[in-house]
A protein has these predicted regions:
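Acidic interaction surfaces
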Residues: 1-83
Length: 83
């Protein structure tokens, strides 16, 4: 798969977090929340514990591939651009 398949993001899971949660991540960073807390809140909002066994397994497999370093760096860049 080519990088441009996900608009330059590492994989589909990372791209999905960018599309679905970036605004929330920026807001939470602005409020002083830690990166670990933000990841917990995003995971909690997806409610993997309510998924069936197969859905939960797929969720955690995708979760493990998210490039959080790039996500948080992009969020910080977005914060700097809005100042």
């Amino acid at each position: 798969m080519l990088m441009n398949d996900y608009n330059g993001w590492k994989n589909q899971a990372t791209w999905s977090v960018n599309v679905l949660h970036m605004e929330t991540i920026v807001e939470m960073l602005n409020k002083g929340n830690s990166e670990e807390y933000i990841k917990f809140q995003i995971k909690d909002s997806c409610k993997p514990e309510d998924m069936n066994l197969y859905g939960r397994d797929m969720f955690y497999s995708a979760w493990a591939t998210i490039d959080w370093y790039t996500i948080f760096n992009r969020a910080k860049e977005n914060m700097e651009q809005t100042v």
